[in-house]
Amino acid sequence: MLSNVPPVLNQVNALVVVDNGSTACELAPWQAACKIHGFELIQNAENLGIAEALNQGVHWAQRRGFPWVLLFDQDSKITDGYLEAMFTSWKTHSDPDRVASMHPLYKDTAMGVEGVLRRAEDGGPIVAMTSGALMPTWIFDKIGMFRADYFVDEVDTEYCFRIRAAGYLLAVSPASVLLHHIGHPRKSSFLGLRFTPTHHSALRRYYMSRNRLVVYKKYIWIFPRWVLQSMKDSMVETAKCFLGEENRGRKLRNFLLGTWDGLRGRMGKRENL
């Protein structure tokens, strides 16, 4: 992951890395690198979740007066000219003042394919990953921060829906390419049907099922068509999990537990999964 730092530093004015509960041994190379490369390192004593880590990074930028933030997961890599292309696309957008989140084209490094974003009528993505997004810091003052009680999974989906519900837009920069991978995809088959499950952990299956349900309940009457499409995509992805992955018993248990907690609104970090 340290190799992802120089390409980002070459394109931004400042960089902050938020660590979620790594051991002293794991942190040592990051502590050394931040002194060499001149970036900030926020060290959380425990895993507070991706949403809280993103919020910490955004607050760090806001306190320093930065008008924009560029957000990344730990396993995403940017290409040359990424940020310049982002700003070019934003400036040439038909309504730049309403654009609350700029997104790249995604190239899956595990599968060697480019991800296709479902587009809304305005030409922007309906939802998109937070990783790789360029966002003006004013949007967080307008509609709030990322939902820390989600902990992980669907944090980006919920925020994209919140952006659109508030009347703002998402847009794509076609010349900005983000290299990433989702889960640990491996090809599988069932009754002669070949497919590629993501092989997310059993822990993630809990948060995925819970948070998806919470998002659907909140936005089904605001964006019914988009939510129904997301539900369909989620059902296909979940079916691939239970037909082609290992540890299906525990994953099914966590899926059902997440569904139950989503129905009753139990949020936050869940222990003993």
Task: Describe the predicted segments one by one.
Residues 118-135, 197-200:
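A recurrent flexible, glycine/aromatic-enriched loop bordering the glycosyltransferase active site
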Residues 66-77:
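Short beta-strand-to-loop acidic/aromatic patch adjacent to the donor-nucleotide binding site
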Residues 19-28, 46, 76-77:
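A conserved acidic beta->alpha catalytic loop
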Residues 139, 143-144, 149-182:
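A short, conserved alpha-helix in the catalytic core of glycosyltransferases
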Residues 1-9:
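Short, well-formed alpha-helical segments that are part of the catalytic scaffolds
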